[in-house]
Amino acid sequence: MKDHSKKTIIQKHSYGVLLFTGNEKDRKYLIVQNRDSESFIYFFLAWNIERWNEHYLLKVVKGFSRDELNRLLYYPFDLIYTDLYVNHVKGTYQRQYNRAKFNYTYFHSRADWVKLCQNVPTTEIKWGFSKGRIENGEHPYNCAIRELQEEVGIVENDIVLHPTMSPIHYRNEKLLFRTFVNVCLFPAECPYQLPVIYQQFANTIRCMSVSNEILHARWVSLEESFFLLPTNLYRLLYEFHITNRS
C-alpha cells in the first residue's frame, strides 16, 4: 500500500529578467506591473477548490485587485476567461477552460462564499520582474529575452547579458511552490543612457505588449523599489545590488 501521508511538491520553474541601467551611483531597475494578480490567476487554475475552507478562500481573494473581485462577483465566466487567457494554446486551452469554469461555477453555487467575499479588502496588483514559463528545449536566457519582448516590447538588440551574473533563484511558497529564475540583463547602451525605446516615455511607460499580460513598466531606484516590490523580490534586488557592484 502506498504511503500518502507525505505531500509531494512538484517544482515549477519560471524564468524572468532583472533588467537594469545607469551607473553605480544612479542605477535603475525595470519592474513591470502585471495585468492580473497572481491570486486571481491561481483562483482559476487551482485544483480541488471544493475542499477550500473559508479561511483559505479569503486568503486567496485578499490578493485580488478590486477590479478582479468585481469581475469574479458580477461578470459572466466567458468574458472573464477571454480576458484572462489571451493566448489560446491548442490542447491546454480546453483543459484550463474546464478547470477555470468549474472553479467559477462552484464559487457562485456557494451563496455563503459570494456573500463573504463581497466586502473583502483587496490589494493593488503587484509590481515585479517580467517572467514566464520556459518552453521545451529552450535555454533560460532565450526564454528571458522572449518574455521581455512579448511582455514589454524590448528586442534582443536592446540588451546584453551582465558579464558576471548567473541566474538568481528564489522561491514563492504561496504560489504553487514555483521557483522563479531571474536572468540578469542590461541595456546595450548602459551605463550611459537608456535604450531609445524608453527615451520618449520618461520614468513610467505604457508597455508595447503583444500578450496583454503587463500593464506598465517603470524604471525605479533601489529605494523606490522598497515601496512597490514584494518583500522577497526587494530582498533579491538588494542582494543583487550589494554583491554585483561595477
Spans of model-derived segments:
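Conserved Nudix-box catalytic region and its N-terminal flanking loop in Nudix hydrolases
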Residues: R27-R146, I154
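Short acidic-glycine loop/turn motifs at beta-strand connectors
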Residues: T21-D26
